[in-house]
Amino acid sequence: QKETLGKANEVLAEARDRSIPIIYVEVVRGERTPDTEIHHDITPKAGEAVLTKSRTGPFSTTEIDEVLRKQGIETLALMGISTSGCVLTTVRWASDIDYKLVVLSDCCADQDDEVHRVLMEKLFPRQATVVTSQQFLRALG
């Protein structure tokens, strides 16, 4: 997980340098605990949106769609822990409501490495462009 967070941090730093909007989504079911906090290696900076969801995906329990559309955002670059949970749900829902998607494969992780691999290689490419963090950063120019 440390390597995943390090790569995510590189992408976040470049996005900040380029003034690309960053939106964090945290999950809190019931009481807040240290396990529900955003990891200290990728802490949001001042002015970055942090939305709190109570379900697996962000679209059913947050105002994320409204926030994105108000900013004119049409393409989402996704990173997250729980490839088979949060990331999968976000890919499916966001695709259904016409967002263009890029999933950063090495900025996502799952408890089951094989499930992560299958999602990245077989399922996500049907609805998203799957790239590594380095490929994404190179594409930014």
How would you name each of these model-derived features?
Residues 1-13:
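Short catalytic helix/loop segments, enriched in acidic residues and glycine
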Residues 10-18, 30-141:
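Active-site-adjacent betaalpha module
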